[in-house]
Structure formats: structure tokens, C-alpha cells
Amino acid sequence: MAQKALEQTTVKEEKLELPTTIRGLAQLLDIPLVDCLLPCNFCGRFLDYLEVCEFDYKKLTLIWKDYSVYACCRLCCSATATYEFNVFYQQTVLGRDIELATGLSIFEIDIRCHTCLSFLDIIEKLDSCGRGLPFHKVRNAWKGVCRQCKHFYNDW
């Protein structure tokens, strides 16, 4: 019985040690970031170097399946964001009303871009609040528009 508990603890510890970022994986393997070849979890295509950098910049998390690692390419990030918005949309608030809806300060709210899934920094969040742009609640998480995707909406 004690041995079984020890084995379960060991398995849990092993899973906790798996890196969640590509940079962390590269450091663990002691290889340059440019040499990391990761398949996309959705389409199977390998991420190019720019997508590898974007993945970590967006603060996305690696997906581990039986000790095989997967990431998400740029196109699949956009497709996933669109799918989640269309299927799991809950509500929309404008500008500073997000603080009333959540009961939190804009500084404390985690917001991702609803187009590319990048985390919005404080400047992007304050800009959206100041302009009265919409924030959408999708799958119990808040979505806005990042500075790069704003250009697609001609809002710069």
C-alpha cells in the first residue's frame, strides 16, 4: 500500500517537472530556442521560429500527451479563438464596465486577445477601457483586442 502511494507521488512529481513554455523546454534540453521543433496540437504542422517566439510571448502553455509535447501554431490559435468565441460566448461589456462586471480592477483582470489569444498588457487594457472598446466573456475568461490585432479592425 505504501509503495503504491509512493509510485503515485513520483508520477505526480514527474508531471510537475515538465516545462510549460518552449523556452523552459529548450533550457531543460540545453538546446537553442531556434532548434526547438514542436508540432501543432491541432494541425500537426511544425511551428516555425517566429511562431515559437509568439507562443511564449502569448503566454500559452505546452500540451503534454504521454511525454510527447505539442504547441499551437498561429493559424490554429486564431481558429481556436474564433471557435471558442462562436461556441462559448457569454457576455459583452464596454470599456471600464469590465471592472463592474468582475468586481476587480482592470490591473487584476487577465484578458486575452479574442483574435490571436495573446495576453493583453496593461497599456492595451487601459487603451481599450479609454476608447470604450468591448470586452467579451468567453468560456469564463475575458477577451479583448491586442495592439497587433487592432490593425485588422482599423482602430489605430
Curated annotation (Swiss-Prot):
Zn-finger (unnamed) residues: 40-76, 113-149
GO BP: any one term: symbiont-mediated suppression of host innate immune response
Keywords from the UniProt entry: Activator, DNA-binding, Early protein, Host cytoplasm, Host nucleus, Host-virus interaction, Inhibition of host innate immune response by virus, Metal-binding, Modulation of host cell apoptosis by virus, Transcription, Transcription regulation, Viral immunoevasion, Zinc, Zinc-finger
Gene: E6
Localization per Swiss-Prot or TrEMBL: Host cytoplasm; Host nucleus
SUPFAM superfamilies, per database record: E6 C-terminal domain-like
Entry keyword annotation includes rRNA processing: no
Name of a matching Pfam family: E6
Subunit structure of this chain's protein: Forms homodimers. Interacts with ubiquitin-protein ligase UBE3A/E6-AP; this interaction stimulates UBE3A ubiquitin activity. Interacts with host BAK1.
GO cellular component: host cell cytoplasm; host cell nucleus
Family indicated by similarity: Belongs to the papillomaviridae E6 protein family.
Gene Ontology MF terms in the entry: DNA binding; zinc ion binding
Functional description taken from the UniProt entry: Plays a major role in the induction and maintenance of cellular transformation. E6 associates with host UBE3A/E6-AP ubiquitin-protein ligase and modulates its activity. Protects host keratinocytes from apoptosis by mediating the degradation of host BAK1. May also inhibit host immune response.
InterPro entries: E6, E6_sf
Organism: Human papillomavirus 47
Official protein name in the record: Protein E6
Gene3D superfamilies to which the protein is assigned, alphabetical: E6 early regulatory protein
